[in-house]
Amino acid sequence: MKIAVVVHDYLPRHVGGTEIHAHQVASELVRRGHEVVAFSTERDLEAPEGDLRSFELDGVRGTEMVHQREYADVRESWTQSLAAETLRSLLARERPEVVHFQHLSLWGSRGIAIARERGARVVVTLNDFFLLCDDAVLLDPELELCTRAERGECSQCLRRHPLRPERWLDAPQGLELEEYWERAALERYEWHKRDLLLADVVVCPSRFLADRFLAAGMLRESQVRVLKYGYPGERHAPRPSDPSQPLRVGYVGGIYPSKGVHVLVEAMAQLAGEPLELSIWGALDWFPDYVAGLRERAAGAAVRFEGRYPPGEVDRVLQGFDVLVVPSIWYENMPLTIQEAFRNAVPVVTTDLGGMAESVEHERSGLLFPRGDAAALAAALRRLAGDRALLQRLAEGHPHVPQLGEVVDQLEEFYAGVRSPGAAR
């Protein structure tokens, strides 16, 4: 079977959960004898927008399109006319039987309709809330949980896009500008809703995420397949924690506000002088002002900023922890780091919210704490530091973590299956 995988960014330059998962699936499909082509984008201010470049990684042949990610009119951020026409030509050239969209950012949801026009089966994986929320995390500008996206009331967040005034000759002003943003927000919602309803199968890694899209009217239940991520590598047995040593607390992932790293650092500041130490792993150069604030608040606490790590070394990093903390202040979907921790028999302390709460059973595979509550997080960590028997029980109580092969088995069924009942033609 010939399969096209479409994603906004790709390895090795972009090392995020979606990019890693997309490539792991693609390379496993190649190993099974399928022909896989990947389409991605790359920002390059020195190259003309729309330029195409070839790459190959682990048997996956790919094409990346230069995309400068700036728009004269905010509507371009979802219509993506250049990207859509580029995708049309790539699909005409490659003629895949299946198109699997791992992320629609920078390509635009119109790609779903284009793939259908080509006669391909269409599978979409919703790795976050991007089609529902322009910022993908369902937070308002004050970092509070947002429910307006389900009604297409996103005008405030749309204003964040970089515009090119020199190309925007008829820019609206005053009240007209306010109306423009309101209309644009509703148009974005309707645009994505229309296109997503065309997909044959929509893979949702968590039930929580599926329910949010269903509530917004952007999916039919008949399209939905809830399928957790799968992971290569062996499962590890629990390791005892030495009560004579400080509790080794770890964080792995993006270091920016929605990930709630400030909540964890504040908790550690409250625990200064107690037998705990924290290692923070992740890129320190993406949000330098935020990181500077974290360093300032961490002064005097046992906190180390470790920086990046190669994706292939996640087991080594996780096995250096007694407990992983996932303190995100947004809903998350199905955090890869939680599942990786379970595969390594590392218990998890995480926010009682969204996909995190769906992943971790309180008092069985980890502990939950209220969103943004540093004092509650500190209390949970203090409890684990003083009760290593509890820590061991939590390490032994992790749920089954699917292997990559199990997940690709399911995807092959989706690829080969008939179109969903009631899917648009």
Q: How would you name each of these model-derived features?
A:
Residues 20, 251-270, 375:
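A conserved mid-protein helix/loop that constitutes part of the nucleotide-sugar donor-binding site
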Residues 167-223:
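A short, active-site helix/loop in glycosyltransferases that binds the activated sugar's phosphate group
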Residues 277-292:
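Glycosyltransferase donor-sugar binding loop
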Residues 291-312:
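Nucleotide-activated donor-binding/catalytic signature segment of Leloir-type glycosyltransferases, i.e.
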